[in-house]
């Protein structure tokens, strides 16, 4: 096998373009055990996600988890699947299209905006290859994780770097590391909450539920826990909420190890037992609604809270395609590629002259 993938044919006199690659976690191709199994295998084989020695983890993964979990996970996906497909995939694709439109409206036209999934399809490798074929010599990678974590953002960066080891002609690469405290992002979160409250009234308690990670990751220096707290504090301040009316929790614990606390579902059950009238839950760590928000929070946690004695439960959707969120995303992107945009685009006459010189020198294209 060749060490490097073949380079696409180059046409002299073609202007350089900038690629914007949005990346989210991923999704199976269908809500079936057969489709979930390879997706879970790819996800749980990532050493950034599971930091257990391979000799110990492989028998557990292949002998136990991949034989038991796909069917259960498929049932959960089926509960939130739409006619358009996986909600995460649908929202991410729409966000990419909207971002391209917002950039174009702002006069940024020499860009290619696309999207990929860290696990599943479309893969990072395939979309990077497509960007190269479209003439992108500069690429900004935007992991759609507001808070940085080694298991999410760093995994995306690992995958991009791994793909580029197979390229001969490398592009200039930049990454968005996080945007947990970006004013536009926090402002969009606050407005989404206020919009919900304007229609349904305010709750007794607002719970901000973030995806959890093992506590060991925090102990080893992962900044995720701190960035979640920053986001929660800024959001509470935007909403003018006193400390007794909101709290931060962590969801989606996997395995038996201790994860970041407090855990979301036990917290909601405790609120229910206390007779809390109404709880609203928002998930500020997710840019799009997905399995963890629509099934785990909106269905499972709702049942847990009401079953424990709570009176009313509201799930506040993720930002998805909200105008203020796409505007914030546009600002995040423009702030990272500003100097790229300042580079003058050669006039058509200059490009034609470049192409002619290349052909005179013997180039075929």
UniProtKB/Swiss-Prot annotation:
Annotated EC: 4.98.1.1
Catalytic activity: heme b + 2 H(+) = protoporphyrin IX + Fe(2+)
Cystine crosslinks: none
Coiled-coil features, chain-numbered ranges: none
Domain of life: Bacteria
GO biological process: heme biosynthetic process
Cellular component terms (Gene Ontology): cytoplasm
InterPro entries: Ferrochelatase (IPR001015), Ferrochelatase_AS (IPR019772), Ferrochelatase_C (IPR033644), Ferrochelatase_N (IPR033659)
The protein's role, per its UniProt record: Catalyzes the ferrous insertion into protoporphyrin IX.
UniProt xrefs under NCBIfam families: hemH
Name of this protein: Ferrochelatase
Native source species: Aromatoleum aromaticum (strain DSM 19018 / LMG 30748 / EbN1) (Azoarcus sp. (strain EbN1))
């Amino acid at each position: 096998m060749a060490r490097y993938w073949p380079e696409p044919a180059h046409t002299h006199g073609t202007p350089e373009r900038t690629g914007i690659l949005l990346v989210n976690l991923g999704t199976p191709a269908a809500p079936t055990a057969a489709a979930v199994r390879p997706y879970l295998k790819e996800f749980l084989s990532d050493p950034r996600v599971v930091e257990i020695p391979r000799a110990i983890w492989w028998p557990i993964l292949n002998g136990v988890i991949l034989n038991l979990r796909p069917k259960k996970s498929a049932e959960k996906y089926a509960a939130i699947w739409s006619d358009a497909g996986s909600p995460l995939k649908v929202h991410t694709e729409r966000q990419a299209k909207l971002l391209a439109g917002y950039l174009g409206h702002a006069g940024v036209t020499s860009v290619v905006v696309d999207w990929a999934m860290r696990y599943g399809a479309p893969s990072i490798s395939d979309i990077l290859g497509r960007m190269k074929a479209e003439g992108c010599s500069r690429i900004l990678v935007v992991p759609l994780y507001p808070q940085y974590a080694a298991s999410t953002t760093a995994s995306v960066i690992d995958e991009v770097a791994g793909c580029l080891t197979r390229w001969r002609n490398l592009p200039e690469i930049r990454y968005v590391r996080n945007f947990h405290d970006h004013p536009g992002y926090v402002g969009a979160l606050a407005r989404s909450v206020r919009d919900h409250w304007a229609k349904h009234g305010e709750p007794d308690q607002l719970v901000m539920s973030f995806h959890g990670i093992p506590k060991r990751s925090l102990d080893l220096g992962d900044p995720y826990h701190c960035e979640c707290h920053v986001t929660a504090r800024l959001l509470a301040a935007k909403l003018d909420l006193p400390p007794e009316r909101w709290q931060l929790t962590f969801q989606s614990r996997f395995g038996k190890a201790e994860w970041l606390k407090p855990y979301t579902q036990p917290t909601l059950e405790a609120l229910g037992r206390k007779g809390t009238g109404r709880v609203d839950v928002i998930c500020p760590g997710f840019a799009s609604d997905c399995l963890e928000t629509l099934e785990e929070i909106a269905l499972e946690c709702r049942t847990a809270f009401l079953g424990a004695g709570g009176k009313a439960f509201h799930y506040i959707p993720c930002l998805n395609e909200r105008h203020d969120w796409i505007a914030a995303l546009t600002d995040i992107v423009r702030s990272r590629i500003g100097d790229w945009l300042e580079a003058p685009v050669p006039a058509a006459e200059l490009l034609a002259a470049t192409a002619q010189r290349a052909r005179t020198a013997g180039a075929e294209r």
